[in-house]
């Protein structure tokens, strides 16, 4: 394709001519809002399916997962708002049961695996034979229960049967597992046991719930599939792995020729594939498999871990040798079948991550893009393939642990995904994720997938939120011109060797896609668009190593930044066919690296930065020393300072003299800038003015979960004090559903975080799990209602010897006044504390506080005194509209 090479002369002229557009309080008033998603669902190993029998314009989508996890949504909910159904199904009895017996009467889930519908099948010779009843619970290892062992179902509509088919793995110890098929006329059940599809663990070594160890294979379909009359030597082994798979994690799909396939398996022997019978949804026994080692047909003997095809288990397509890799899922997108796998362990520190391979055929070979010819998804020996100590990188890593700054917690251990092309032609990936600081809690997330120029999948940087563009739009339309693309971006790179055991995660850095086609900032390089498309090419130095230049091919799309309504132009890109770099004569493995970029709306980013920035002084303050100036912007915005008199105070905040000085803070992004003047009196001998802050929770609602709704951070130097003023709003459900003040060494969620205290409003220190140091005169009978809407006036002091004290006066809406204090000594005596508020089922808002405004009258403008808008927020003299100065109101035009 012809590339749109940016005109250097015209764009350089544009650079030189670009003026900054000033914005004031009015321009930023409604620049953005935070968003809360209340329909989150916790379904582990989510498999998504569209109800093809219902509405075509707003169809229902279902997800089923392990342990009978289930939920549904309408497409109009953007795959974020889910609702469970048939709650309580896992209890005793049949109330709300998902399952029925062969007589159509509801049965409890534990009894759903005992009696099958199918009585006859065709064997490996095409002969119709009896299909003996197979009790899947009886096949589980002795002592195993059904509850807790129903893993990772996959659901598909069988067009021939005109039934929904659910493929469920009933796991057992010692590989005594079975994948079975249930059928239903409705996606919500009841599901009836159709029959077994494939089972494992028939080595004759392990006792089952319903069968003895010896001769256990006779109770399976092994003879029907292979014609054997005795247990073949390869299965008669003390160590099932690394030859035999564990029959879990099914994925069922149609190929382009309408054949029905199932992939399955996990660590141990790897991922296998068998063909299914469209007439009954079970295994197609007439489709046979040779015994092959390394792709060569040979006489079967003892177990060989290099076997690539087995007469019973089918064709191996990935993994093997006990190497990590499970949760296979195959989805056709465009030209290729894409094989998704989850490497690593599923816990928060386990390193779970999604890898992708592709093939032009449904049964492979599946390869990645990490070499010019691709690395096969199968392994020939054991090797560690995930985490910081990995010995080999394989498979395109879609993304790893990460956190955009609007996210309350970093995503960790994303995996066991499904994928779908929805009713509007948008490819989506559906996965579960764990989170930093949330133990092993997990939730479902959905991102859009795109195909880049080289035919590799790339994931959109943010959650899917109703975006409409498809791969066809990207390939055939230039949705954005060069002037729209140029600007300030946050970027996240997803390395292979992430220290997942330490729960490390990637955070955004700032880069600038300059109008002349260059890239500056954290990484340097160049960029270009591809004419007539929405593809973007980037060459970046520093992503893989300091000196390596890596080429990326990606896609441009507009998205909504997570947990906000802020629009952002995003890129998602992959280093693939030409991504191998050379540095210092050494060849570096840089293929398969995924990167994300996000160019937030400029005004929203400026406003977000202002809301998240704590200036450690007020206009007119007297300072006997200069606190650290905030210089870190957000969402790609930057903060700079300019002194009116560097001989008194430099731009960097270094005190040089004594007297009055004006410090001007400028927050800028993409041609817009906001400025604010602070007139300060610098006097080393004067009593310092206590700074007053008006903190605001990120989410202004009373439904937020614990450790998700934070204020900005506030720095408190040893020997200093600060004041906080805010209103507290609560759902009044529990005493702890109110503000909590935390003190730590750095921002929550950052590596190396050390917590000193967590003072709850209700007389409790969360960190110490004690009320030691808390003193109050609360009336507990009315406490919960008293706190809702209360005004909090708090002073916090921290001494150089580590002594910390908080005193608060709390005024209720009925004018009752409470006094609350907390004191402690921090043994390590840090030179600075990082303070922040966090709320559960509540929020705080200091932005709406009055600022000493008396009854207003209209008079002429005065040029002295502090300016406030009608919301009580301090503004500068460029503000247009009604303002209050010295308690008087006037209109500034």
Predicted features by range, described:
Residues 18, 851-893:
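C-terminal outer-membrane/trafficking sorting elements
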């Amino acid at each position: 394709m012809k590339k749109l090479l940016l005109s250097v002369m015209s764009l350089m002229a544009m650079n030189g001519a670009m003026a900054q557009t000033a914005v004031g309080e009015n321009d930023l008033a409604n620049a953005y809002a935070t968003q809360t998603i209340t329909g989150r669902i916790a379904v582990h190993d989510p498999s998504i399916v569209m109800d093809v029998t219902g509405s075509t314009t707003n169809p229902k989508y279902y997800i089923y997962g392990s342990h009978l996890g289930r939920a549904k949504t309408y497409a109009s909910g953007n795959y974020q708002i889910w609702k469970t159904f048939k709650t309580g199904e896992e209890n005793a009895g049949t109330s709300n049961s998902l399952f029925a017996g062969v007589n159509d009467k509801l049965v409890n889930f534990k009894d759903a695996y005992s009696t099958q519908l199918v009585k006859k099948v065709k064997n490996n010779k095409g002969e119709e034979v009896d299909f003996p009843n197979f009790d899947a619970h009886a096949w589980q290892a002795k002592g195993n229960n059904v509850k807790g062992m129903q893993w990772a179902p996959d659901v598909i509509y069988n067009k021939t049967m005109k039934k929904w088919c659910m493929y469920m793995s009933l796991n057992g110890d010692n590989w005594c597992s079975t994948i079975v098929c249930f059928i239903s006329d409705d996606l919500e059940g009841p599901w009836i046991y159709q029959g077994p599809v494939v089972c494992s663990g028939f080595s004759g070594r392990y006792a089952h719930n319903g069968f003895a160890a010896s001769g256990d294979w006779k109770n399976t379909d092994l003879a029907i599939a292979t014609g054997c009359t005795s247990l073949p030597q390869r299965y008669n082994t003390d160590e099932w792995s690394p030859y035999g798979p564990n029959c879990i994690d099914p994925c069922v799909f149609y190929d382009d020729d309408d054949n029905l396939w199932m992939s399955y398996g996990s660590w141990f022997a790897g991922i296998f594939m068998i063909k299914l019978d469209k007439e009954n949804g079970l295994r197609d026994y007439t489709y046979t498999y040779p015994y092959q080692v390394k792709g060569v047909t040979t006489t079967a003997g003892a177990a060989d871990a290099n076997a690539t095809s087995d007469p019973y288990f089918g064709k191996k397509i990935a993994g093997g040798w006990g190497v990590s890799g499970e949760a296979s899922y195959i989805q056709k997108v465009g030209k290729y079948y894409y094989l998704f796998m989850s490497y690593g362990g599923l816990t928060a520190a386990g390193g779970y991550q999604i890898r992708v391979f592709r093939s032009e055929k449904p049964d492979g070979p599946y390869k990645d893009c990490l070499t010019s010819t691709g690395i096969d998804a199968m392994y020939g020996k054991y090797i560690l393939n995930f985490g910081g100590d990995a010995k080999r990188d394989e498979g395109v890593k879609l993304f790893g642990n990460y956190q955009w700054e609007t996210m309350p917690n970093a995503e960790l251990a994303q995996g066991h995904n499904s994928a779908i092309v929805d009713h509007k032609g948008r490819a989506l990936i559906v996965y579960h994720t764990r989170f930093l600081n949330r133990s092993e809690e997990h939730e479902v997330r959905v991102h859009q997938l795109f195909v880049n120029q080289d035919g590799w999948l790339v994931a959109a940087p943010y959650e899917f939120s109703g975006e409409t563009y498809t791969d066809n739009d990207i390939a055939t339309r230039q949705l954005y011109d060069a002037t729209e693309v140029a600007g300030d971006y946050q970027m996240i790179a997803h390395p292979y060797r992430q220290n997942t055991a330490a729960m490390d995660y990637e955070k955004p850095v700032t880069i600038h896609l300059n109008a002349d086609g260059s890239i500056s900032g954290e990484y340097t390089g160049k960029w270009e668009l591809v004419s007539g498309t929405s593809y973007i090419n980037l060459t970046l130095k520093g992503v893989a190593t300091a000196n390596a230049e890596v080429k990326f091919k990606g896609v441009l799309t507009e998205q909504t930044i997570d947990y906000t309504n802020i629009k952002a132009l995003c890129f998602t890109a992959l280093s693939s066919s030409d991504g191998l770099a050379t540095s210092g004569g050494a060849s570096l493995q840089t293929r398969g690296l995924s990167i994300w970029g996000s160019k937030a709306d400029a005004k929203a980013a400026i406003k977000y930065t202002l809301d998240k920035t704590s200036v450690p002084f007020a206009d007119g303050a007297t300072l006997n020393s200069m606190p650290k100036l905030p210089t870190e912007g957000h969402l790609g915005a930057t903060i700079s300072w300019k002194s009116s008199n560097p001989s008194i105070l430099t731009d960097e905040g270094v005190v040089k003299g004594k007297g009055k000085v004006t410090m001007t803070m400028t927050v800028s992004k993409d041609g817009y800038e906001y400025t604010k003047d602070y007139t300060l009196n610098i006097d080393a001998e004067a009593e310092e003015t206590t700074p007053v802050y008006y903190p605001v929770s990120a989410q202004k609602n009373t439904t937020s979960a614990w450790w998700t709704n934070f204020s900005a951070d506030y720095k408190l130097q040893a020997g200093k004090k600060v004041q906080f003023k805010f209103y507290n709003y609560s759902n009044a459900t529990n005493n702890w559903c109110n503000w909590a003040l935390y003190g730590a060494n750095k921002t929550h969620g950052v590596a190396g975080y050390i917590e000193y205290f967590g003072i709850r409003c209700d007389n409790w220190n969360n960190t110490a799990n004690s009320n030691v140091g808390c003193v109050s005169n609360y009336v507990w009978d009315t406490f919960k209602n008293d706190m809702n809407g209360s005004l909090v006036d708090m002073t916090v002091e921290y001494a150089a010897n580590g002594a910390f004290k908080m005193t608060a006066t709390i005024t209720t809406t009925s004018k009752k006044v409470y006094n609350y204090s907390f004191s402690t000594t921090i043994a390590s005596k840090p030179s600075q504390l990082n303070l922040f508020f966090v709320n559960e089922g509540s929020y705080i808002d200091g932005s709406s506080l009055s600022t000493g405004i008396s009854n207003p009258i209209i008079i002429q403008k005065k040029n002295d005194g502090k300016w406030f808008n009608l919301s009580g927020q301090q503004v500068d003299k460029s503000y247009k509209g009604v303002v209050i100065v010295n308690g008087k109101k006037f209109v500034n035009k």
